[in-house]
């Protein structure tokens, strides 16, 4: 299944505290992806807006949450909600011929939604693991 990837989106310290409700399931999904030999990638959001208080590059808030099982060094950053706007991530997809994605993380109403929409629009097969996503209240 090397043409498939598990994509873990924005499970960072500045994300909603609701991530704690899904972190065990996300880690189970990571274990499953390892067993199936899927690529496992992590997407981090960087907020470059002036005066921002969250997801500032180089801060604790921008770091992946400590409970997250990080099993690869395939960590990509984005500055917009759609993960495909990360040039490094899209280059990785193309380099490895990835065409199918399993998506987990946050925020369901923003980055998950935007990424899945744009992946589908780009012709990729997308699966959202519904027990592995969260949103703000």
Walk through the language-model features, giving the residues of each.
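A short alpha/beta connector and helix-capping loop motif
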Residues: 19-33, 37-45
């Amino acid at each position: 299944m090397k043409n498939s990837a598990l994509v873990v989106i924005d499970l960072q310290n500045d994300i909603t505290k609701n991530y704690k409700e899904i972190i065990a399931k996300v880690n189970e999904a990571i274990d499953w992806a390892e067993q199936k030999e899927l690529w496992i990638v992590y997407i981090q959001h960087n907020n470059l807006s002036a005066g921002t208080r969250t997801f500032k590059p180089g801060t604790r808030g921008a770091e992946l949450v400590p409970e997250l099982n990080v099993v690869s060094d395939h960590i990509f950053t984005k500055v917009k909600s759609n993960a495909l706007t990360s040039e490094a991530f899209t280059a990785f997809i193309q380099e490895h011929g990835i065409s199918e994605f399993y998506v987990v993380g946050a925020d369901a109403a923003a980055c998950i939604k935007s990424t899945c929409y744009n992946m589908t629009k780009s012709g990729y097969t997308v699966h959202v693991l519904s027990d592995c996503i969260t949103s703000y209240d």
